[in-house]
Amino acid sequence: MRNVKGGVWKNTEDEILKVAIMKYGLNQWARISSLLTRKSPAQCKARWHEWLDPSIKKTEWSKEEEEKLLHLAKIFPSQWKTIAPLVGRTASQCLERYNRLLDEVQRQQDNENGGGSGGGGTTTTTTTTTGENDPRRLRMGDIDPTPETKPAKPDPIDMDEDEKETLSEAKARLSNTQGKKEKRKFREKQLEEARRLAFLQKKRELKAAGINYNPKKKGKEKSWDISKEIPFYLKPKAGFYDVPDEELRDEPNKDASFIGKRVDQIENPNYLQRQEKLNKLEDIKKSKKEIFNLPQLISETSKSNDVEHSIKRTKLQLPEPQLTDDDIQEISDYEKLNGSGSGGGSGGVGVGEFPLPAPRTASISSTAANNNTNNIRTPMKQDTIMSEAQNLLALSNAQTPLKGGAGPNVSQTPLPKSVNNSTPFRTPNPLANQTPTQHNKKQSLNDSNEFAIEDKFKRQQGKNQLLSNLKNLPSPTIEYKLELPSELPTIEDDTTLELDNSEIHIREQQQLKHKEQFKLRNRSTVLKRNLPRSRNLFPINKNNNNNNNNNINQDELRILKEINRIISHDNKTFPNDSITPSSTFDDDDDDDNHHHHHDDIDNNSINDNDEKYENYDYFTNTELEFADKLIRDEIEQIKQELKQPLPSSNEILEEIDQIRSQFIYLPKENQFIEKSNANQTQLIENLQFEYDKTLNKIKNSSMKSVNLEKKLNIYNGGYQNRSNTIIKNIDDMFDQLEQSEIEYQCFVALKNNESIQMEKRLKSIENQVYDQCEIESRLQQKYAQLLNEKNLLKKKLSIF
């Protein structure tokens, strides 16, 4: 079966084409197409230049681009390859957009001719014919003539065998680095490397033989290196004057301090440091205020977040009225006096009527005249794109000019701004646009008076015609009156506005925050200062209510009731679940549990008395300050009555400790009694409670110590391991030091022994040398004696 090339491009084919272009470039299309069995070289080239090239613009067409396209299509008809680079699009994109614009104009003309709607409005160029009415939509069985300009078809989950084979072959070829060309390149690279190594070996051998071989410098000893020195250059001598400015100007590194710096470093280098310092100071002030003056910080925050202090929407600021109330009143009176059918004339004022002033009457008449005329409107902007497309459609449908007759009706459109005007700018000629002046009287053939009389007659005739036309105008059907409203419209408050969910949520969060701040602001001073809380309510004797004669008891009763009300309110608003009653008044022996043991409250006793103290009064800051002032004044009065200084804090604490030691706590009865009035059973009960309490403290302390030990092991585990390693290294180094010290002492002793034995060995060697010298001298003498005897014997033998 013959393989027909072409068709829709697939995603795998696009990817293969991209990789092949990366390897083979943009000129070897035959080699690139050999990787794609279903595509020809021309199709591969068209696919790259029409779709895959990253420089192709695929966004929506702008108005300027459409104007430029239509203008260039009129100048270069059917020359899309020439128009495409000027517009910044591909040729197929330009042709497709041009045809769509013509189709849009044709559709509008068909609707107008067919009586369709759309005569009152203008259609924009962004609307395109879609659906079944699009003439370029592919039907069933149609073949896309330009598949290179369409998006790629996605890869199926199950690919065909042919596609898999093409993909595997392309992978193998594109990843092949062992072909003939690659082998030849590798062989050439190896030969070049071998040549370089041989040259280095030769140079090394020549250098070892004392010959400096440098082929680059051969034949260049007598020439100048212009990059390093200047021929025949003589350094100028120092003159009589200093030239620091010229040296600074010619300095190559004069801008080194400027290069590489940011704008903030040049303009204001310390701005960031100052800003950071100010932020740190602001944070420190805020943290100090949180520690030392928390109520003030809470009050300031609540004031800033309060709904009353929030920024309200400002009222509408209108300009001052041109007519005052008196002017409007005069106009309304004038309308009432003249009646509805007077027509606004200036005559006919009845008895008791007063005439309107002349200037104001003139202004009213002029206003009425202006109201009768049509209002000035902004002229509608012409759709240049659609008009240009209509012109091109008319030109394309026009008959040949050889037949003669009138040409197509083409409207003039201004040149778009995106197209450069080829006409050069010239100096304007002011005389060319002036009205021609009248000829000189000496050169005129007729008298000027005749023309003046004729012009005057024409002006009078036109004036009379205008007056007659004005008289024939119909009577007005609509009359306008100016009346003041009886009631001014009320400005709606911001609360009537409908809020969205986000604004409702924000306001709910603000209300919750204000409530929480209100609770914190109205808590007792005991909780504000984090002091020990009361365990239970103070007992009140009901017999005191009947004792009206004793004012002191009544005052104490009121104070106790108020204290119980405050305790009940604090326990309900800020509850504390960890309740363990104590046998003593305080637990100063344990600072960590100081507040926790004092926060113990008997819930049962409090809940029973909640109904008595439900009505809790909230006081303002002014009332609280006034009460505090009264208490301070009373304290000062007591000081003056005592006429002696108040006891010190240590004396007060000693007195309190002495009083506390006289009382014991009974957990079953939940009260304190004097130790002198307690029996044996109550003492045992108190001691048992103290024992249990101490045992609980020990358990809690042990658990805390275990947890702290675990945390310390986590935090200090690495340091402990490192310290153990360092200690081990120190021990090893100390052992080495001891071993080195022992070896040193051994070598010192060995040196001393060697120095002593060396003298003995030297003496023995010297003695041996002396003995050897004596032996040699004796042997030399013996040798000389024997040599003489030999010579004598030779002489004797020679005689015989």
Curated annotation (Swiss-Prot):
Residues 409-445, 573-584 have a biased composition (Polar residues). It is found in: Nucleus; Cytoplasm. Keywords: Cell cycle, Coiled coil, Cytoplasm, DNA damage, DNA repair, DNA-binding, mRNA processing, mRNA splicing, Nucleus, Repeat, RNA-binding, Spliceosome. The keyword Chloroplast does not apply. GO terms for biological process: DNA repair; mRNA splicing, via spliceosome. Gene3D superfamilies: Homeodomain-like. Its main location: nucleus. SMART domains: SANT (SM00717). Residues 1-56, 57-106 form the HTH myb-type domain. Residues 133-142, 592-601 have a biased composition (Basic and acidic residues). Residues 361-376 have a biased composition (Low complexity). One of its GO terms (cellular component) is cytoplasm. GO terms for molecular function: DNA binding; RNA binding. Component of the precatalytic, catalytic and postcatalytic spliceosome complexes. Belongs to the CEF1 family. This is Cell division cycle 5-like protein. It comes from Dictyostelium discoideum (Social amoeba).
